[in-house]
Amino acid sequence: MNYPHPIIAREGWPFIAIAAVIALLIHAVGGFGFAWPFWLLLVFVVQFFRDPQRPIPAQPNAVLCPADGRIVAVETAQDPYANREALKISVFMNVFNVHSQRSPVDGAISKVEYFPGAFLNAAIDKASTENERNAVVIQTASGKTVTSVQIAGLIARRILCYVRAGEPLSRGQRYGFIRFGSRVDVYLPLGSRAKVSIGEKVYASSTILAELEQ
């Protein structure tokens, strides 16, 4: 699948431009000795908004990771967006991870729902239910329900979602972005087999989170 997005996310272009102008102005006035922290900030902002293409596994029953980060939960939990018991897998993104979100499965969106909330540390469990979040509920062609939830964090305070109910999604398709550290929860049907463990480093689209029961 082609990834029709620039390697530096458009969401970051204004921040990069501002950081570059500040660094250039301070360098022009005070030289590199004064400007180096601002050049360093520019490098950080550029790396934060990187958005590389990733290989997408072809395995038909695979649930792909929706974001880069580290696994912080693999457990049975209530999926409040689809009213069911589910297998929940949570990915925590720190400020050094890629922050775009990509669809874990092929399917059609049955619901997109936004919830205002707090901005707790996204690595802790109660962030799933108390923080600002946006849920995308996807129905696969085989009738399976997969819920992907963008969750704001302590630093991240802007969730961007570019899809609506009724639209199709393809596995690996970019559908959202969260700025500056956050979390994504994925809820799967009971009977799905987790393929990751807590503490594991994962990558959007290329890591298989789980396998749906066939």
Swiss-Prot record:
Heterodimer of a large membrane-associated beta subunit and a small pyruvoyl-containing alpha subunit. This is Phosphatidylserine decarboxylase proenzyme. It is a peripheral membrane protein. Pathway: Phospholipid metabolism; phosphatidylethanolamine biosynthesis; phosphatidylethanolamine from CDP-diacylglycerol: step 2/2. GO terms for molecular function: phosphatidylserine decarboxylase activity. The gene is psd. It is found in: Cell membrane. Binds 1 pyruvoyl group covalently per subunit. The keyword Membrane applies. It holds the Pfam family PS_Dcarbxylase. The keyword Lipid metabolism applies. It comes from Burkholderia cenocepacia (strain ATCC BAA-245 / DSM 16553 / LMG 16656 / NCTC 13227 / J2315 / CF5610) (Burkholderia cepacia (strain J2315)). Is synthesized initially as an inactive proenzyme. Formation of the active enzyme involves a self-maturation process in which the active site pyruvoyl group is generated from an internal serine residue via an autocatalytic post-translational modification. Two non-identical subunits are generated from the proenzyme in this reaction, and the pyruvate is formed at the N-terminus of the alpha chain, which is derived from the carboxyl end of the proenzyme. GO terms for cellular component: plasma membrane. The active site is at S182. InterPro entries: PS_Dcarbxylase, PSD-A. NCBIfam families: AS_decarb, PRK05305.1-2, PRK05305.1-5, PRK05305.2-5. Its cofactor is pyruvate.
